[in-house]
Amino acid sequence: MKKILVAVVVALFSINAMAQHEIGAIVGGMNGASYKYWFNDALALQADLAVGLTEAYWSQTTNGVTTSRSDGMWDFVLNPNALYHWDLPVSNLKIYAGGGLSIGLYDMLKKQPGQSTKVAGKFGINAAAGLAYDFDAVPLVLAFDFRPGYGLGFGKEQGSNDMFTTHMFDWKIAVALRYKL
């Protein structure tokens, strides 16, 4: 039993010895803070906390009536993604792909006449793909992201007890600059 416990402790410390952290900013379709934790040379967890403007294609059902349209929206989201990285033949350049969640708040920029929604909640999934360049001379990483996603919005109209749900497809393009700790 002691040997198993020692083996588990050694394994946990070796995982942390390989771990690398990156912290920085992301701008574009989402603007905010970006953090990345490396589990090994290829697998990482990236979490972004950001505010963004995007075009959403959505349909909304209120009181059994469904409407569909494309509209601009702002959102404030926590966006954690699991990403797998592959080395490219160019030195220090990696391509990555993965997916994750989008959890936060949103509101439409243009409202229909008489529509005055409060800020609504948002939960969804997204894919993520991009390129990352790791600078040799300084501990910086520059990354370009593309993130298409599907989300579900939910909330209430002001002055009403009627709940609404909104199904939306959105996408974001962003650039991140992170410092390697």
List each language-model region with its residue ranges.
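Short secondary-structure boundary/capping segments within folded domains
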Residues: 24, 36-39, 150, 167
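Sec/Tat signal peptide C-region and signal peptidase I cleavage site
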Residues: 13-19
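Gram-negative (and chloroplast) outer-membrane scaffold detector with strong preference
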Residues: 37-144
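Transmembrane beta-strand segments that form the barrel wall of outer-membrane beta-barrel proteins
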Residues: 19-31, 44-53, 103, 149
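Predominantly the C-terminal beta-signal and adjacent terminal strand-loop region
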Residues: 43, 54-58, 136-181
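Sec-dependent N-terminal signal peptides
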Residues: 4-13
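Transmembrane beta-barrel architecture of outer membranes
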Residues: 22, 30-34, 75-79, 122-126, ...
